[in-house]
Each structure stands twice: as C-alpha cells, then as structure tokens.
C-alpha cells in the first residue's frame, strides 16, 4: 500500500501519517528524515543535498525525487509506505510518477486532510514552546498545569515565529499556490481521497482506515 499524505501546514497530516505507518507496519517517510539520514551517512546523494542546504537553497526537484526513490526502493518498503511532505508541486509529482513507473510501481492513494485556513491559523496560534527544553504544548488541546510555565522544566513558554498568524498565513498562501494543484492532479489519476481534518484525531484516523481498508 503506497500512500501520499496531502494537506496544508498544520492540517495534521504528519500525525495521521505516523498512525497509518504504525497500523499497517509500513515506513513513514518524510523528505526531512531522508535528507538527514543521507547527510549523516555521507551518501553521494546526501553530499549533493548538503551543498544546497548549507547555502540555504532549496534542494532541486530532480535530487529530491532521486532521494525519495532511493528510499522507497529499500527492503522495508516492499509492502508499502506513507509519503509525508512530498510531493509538494506538480513537477515533483510528475517526476515521482515517472520514476516509480520505471520501477513498475505506482501510488495507491493520495489522502488530502482538508482543514479550512481559519481553523489552521487558530490551531497553530495556540501552540506554545518552552524556551528551556523545547517541549511543545497547545493552549486548548495540550495545556500546561500552570499557565505559561513548562511542565517539564519550569521555564516560560513562547509563541514561535513559525506559529504567528502572519507567518502561518504566508505558508498557507504558498501551499495554495504550489500544492493545491496536486488535488486536481491526483483526482485525475483516480487516487485522491479527501477527509475532513477538523474532526478529532482518532475519528479522523478511523475515517482514513475505512478508506484504506482494515
């Protein structure tokens, strides 16, 4: 079972990807993890990626696809995998499909976790991080015992720049411009399934399981 998780930043697709991977005993693959693993191991692809990352540049699509295809070719992916955070654009999706076709593979599902922008801005605006140990909380969903104070180390909590409404809005604009077209792409491919991401985490997971089959 080969699955792509789609959804805006903060929609909760990463959480669901981990839950799917655990239930179906298939790897949860994110491009960030692939980059880190290849750079740490000093692979040829990792060295190439590092030259871009060190300069603060985006890793070119061609190289990202090579890294992803190399990862999904590994033994632990023979029964399937969940791709989280890739592809992000139509060119990436086309390049991935082409590379998989050459291996005699194709994606089975693209699951879009659909959450309205205003919900995401509200959700992410409620996140807080500890200045001391980095532990994360949420004012509504995972509050601290004492308001504004970390349960773990007692230091103060802050709203990270990444979670400020103006930053989230910019990220959502980029998502709608670059990634939203993938909805049409995978609809045309006949593999898109859209789920309501505003429901409880466990309800959402159950809805995804019903699509994938127990």
Q: Residue ranges of each PLM-predicted region?
A:
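Glycine-rich phosphate-binding loop of ATP-dependent small-molecule kinases
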Residues: 1-214
